[in-house]
Amino acid sequence: MPIVTVLRSLRKCAVVPSLLLFLLVAPRPIRAQVSGNSQPQSSPADTSKASTKPQTKNPSLRGPQAKQPAAGATLEADQQRQVGKIYYADGHVDVHYENTRLRADHVEYNEDTQVVLAHGNVQLDYLTQHVEAEDARYEVATGRGSFHHVRATFAVQRRQSPTLLISPNPIYFEAETADRINPDTYKVHKAWMTVCDPQKPTWKFYAPEATVYMRDSVHLENGNFRLFSVPVLYLPYATFPAEKQRASGFLIPDIGDSSSKGLILGDAFYWAPTDWADFTIGANYYSRRGWSQRADLRMRPWENARLDINYNGVVDRGLETSTGTINQGGHEAKLLFTALLPDGWRAVADLDNLSSLTYRIAFSETFVQAINSEVRNAAFLTKNFRGFSLNFAANSYKNYVSATPDTFVSLRTAPEARFSSVDQAPWEKLPIYFSFDAFTGASHREDTVTGFQTPNFVARTEFAPTVTIPFHFGPWLDVTPTFTFRTTYYGGQLQNGLYVGNGFFRTTEEFSLDLRPPTIERVWGDSTTGKRWKHVIEPEIIYTDVNGVKDFARFVRFDEDETLTDTNEIQYGVTQRLYFREGEGGTQELVSWSISEKYFFDPSFGGALVPGERNVFQTTDNLTPFAFLDQARHFSPIVSDIRVEPGRHFDTQFIVNLDPRHGQLTAIGELVKWKPYREYFLTVAHFSVVNLPTPVIDNPPNFDFEPRSNQVRTLIGYGDLTRRGFNSTFGVSYDLSRGSFQNQIAEVGYNGSCCGLGFEYRRFSFGSIRSENQYLVVFRIANLGSLGTLRRPEKIF
C-alpha cells in the first residue's frame, strides 16, 4: 500500500527516526504517497500505515480496474514490512475500506490482487454485520471473502406484529467455513444459527449448507430444527425471513387436540411470487371428523388498490350422536376489494358466501365468529363531485333464524343506481338549501320460515327532493325546518299476505322542525395548575310529521325504506358533556350523558300498528334498536346513554331503556374497559332484554313479544401473547337466562427474547350443534412463527 504511518511502538522509542521521517515528508506530516507502479520512498521499517490511493500521470491510460489498488483503503498495525508487492503487518492490524473494517493479529496484503490474508482473531465489520474467524481471505475491492471457524452476528430490523414474537437479538451463526459472495450474501457450511443467546440457545437451526441473504431471507438445505440441541424436525429445504422480506415455502405445521375433532395435524404452503401479492394454501386433518382446507390470497396490484380472498371449508365425516352422525361440513369464502380508479371513481366489493349457519357454528375458530348469524354482501362503484354522489350498487343481506333446521330471511337489492346531493344553497344571500336522493333498481325477498318469496327482480324507484331553511335568532335559538316530498314506485305488493305483481306509488309529505335552545355552559379551573373543566348542557326538540303512506300492510319489507309510516311526533332530550383541558394541551371529553324520549300524537301510526304483535317502524328504530311497540301508546321508553372516558386507562358505556308504561327497565347494555396498572386489563360486557308480553287478552296464543336475553362476557388478563415475559388471559361468556356457559377461554404463556411457550384451553357450547373442548399448545419462535395451533391472540369482544 502506498500510504504508511508511523508505528505506534516506534513513537515512544525511536525519536530520531521519527524526526527524520517528519523532515522527509513535511507536506504530509505522517504520510508518504507514491504511485501504484513505484516503490515507496520510505523504508518499510519506518512505516505503519498504508493507503491505496494511486497517483497516475494520465488518467485516460489507466490499466484494467481489477489490477489497481483499492481506492481509499488504509492499514494500521504495530509492525509492518514490505516485500515486493506484498505488505506484512503484525499486531493490532486494522484495515479500513469504505464501510468495511477488517482486524486481525497478522495480515498479508497483495497490492496487485488487492487480497488480504488474515490470521488470528479475525474480525470483519460491515454495517450491521460482525464476523469473527480464525483466518480469512478477503478481497478489498469486491468484498468477497472466505472465513474459517466462523462466528457471526447480523442485526436485523423487524416490524412489530400482533401475531409474531419479535426478538431484539441479532441473527447468530457458527460455521466451519463461510464464503462472502458479496456484501449482502453469505454461503455457510456446516452451520447452526439462532436468535437466542449463543451461549445457551433454546433453539437453533442446523444445516450442512445455508445461504444468508441480508435484508431478505435465510435458505437451509437438508437441515433440522433443534430444541435444546435435540433434533425435532427435519427440513430438506427451508427458508425464513432475515428482515422485512417474505420467502416462499412450507409453514410451520399445525398440531392440536379437540374433543370433537380429535387429533389435529396440518400444514400450509406460502408463496410470494412478487412484492405485491402472496398466496397461502393449507389443510388440516381431523382424526374424528375429516379434513379442512384453507386458502388466502392477498394482492396490492397498484397504489390504493387491495384484494383479499379467504376460503375455508371442511369435508366432514359427521358428528356422532345417539341417533347417528350429522354432517356439519361446508365452506365460507370472503372477498374484499377496494380501489381508487381514475377520474375520481372508487370501487368496493365486500362479499361473503356461507354454505350454512351450522358450518359456521361448528367450525369457527373464535366465539365471535361462531355467534354471528348474518351474511352481508356489498359491491358498489361511486363518484363524488361538486356536492353530488353517483353510485351503482348490488347488496344482499341474509339473517339466519335458526341453524337446525336451516332457516333464514334473505334480502337483495341488485342492481341499483343512486344519485344524490348534499345540501346546497343556489343563492348566496338566501339561506335556502336544496338536496335530493333518487334511486332505481330491483329487489328480492325470501323467507324460508314462512315460505314467502318474491320474484327475483321487483322494481323499486324513488325520488325525494328536500328543502332546508335554517333560522338563527342570535345565540338563543336555532330553528331549522325541513320539507321532503318523497315518491316511490313498487313493482309488487302484498295482498292478504301473498305477493301480487300489481305496481303502485307511495307518495309522502314529510316535515321536521329542529329546535335548538341555547346551550348552557360553565367553565372553571385552577390558574396555578392550568387545569380547566367545562360543563355543557345541550337541549334539543325535534317535531316530525309524515303522512301519505297509507295501507302499511301492503309493503314488502326489502329494507328500512319499507318501515316508513305515517307519524306525528315530537322528540325531546338533553345532552350533558364534561370537558377537561390542562395547560395548552388538547381538550378531552370526560363524560357525556344523553337522555331522550318521543311522544306520539298518533299512537296508531296511521293504522300501521298491529296490536299484540312486535311492531318495528323507522321512527322507533331511530330512537332505540330495542322493539317496544306491542299496542298503541303515546310515550316511548326513555333512552339513556352514558359514556365515561377519563383517560387511556378507563372507558365505559351504559345504555338503558326505561319504559314508563311498565315502570321498569326493558333493555340494558353495559361495557367497561379498564387498565388499572401497567399491562393488566379487564373488559366486562352485559346485555339484557326483558321479556314484556302484552296483556293476555290482546295476545295471540303463545305470543312472545321479545325473547328474554341476559348475557355477560368477561375478559381479564395481563400482557398479550407476543409480549416478552409472563402473559395470561381468562375469559367467559355466560347466558344468565339459561344458566349455562357459552364460551370459556384460558391462556397462559411466557415469552423470552428468542422464543415462547403458551397453553390455551377453549370451551364452546352451542346446544346440540357444538360442544367442544380444545387443548392447545404453542411454541413461538421469535421472528419466524409458531409451532402449534394457537396462531394469534383470540378476542372475545
Spans of model-derived segments:
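N-terminal secretory signal peptides that target proteins for export/translocation
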Residues: 1-11
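Structural recognition of beta-strand segments within beta-rich domains
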Residues: 74, 80-103, 108-119, 123-130, ...
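Bacterial N-terminal signal peptides
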Residues: 14-26
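Outer-membrane beta-barrel proteins and related beta-barrel translocases across Gram-negative bacteria
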Residues: 129, 140-193, 198-209, 213-214, ...
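Gly/Ser-centered flexible loop/linker motifs
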Residues: 61, 66-71, 80-88, 258-264, ...
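Compositionally biased, proline/threonine/alanine/serine-rich low-complexity intrinsically disordered stretches
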Residues: 30-71
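Interaction modules related to DNA damage response and DNA replication/repair
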Residues: 58-77, 90-106, 119-133, 149-166, ...
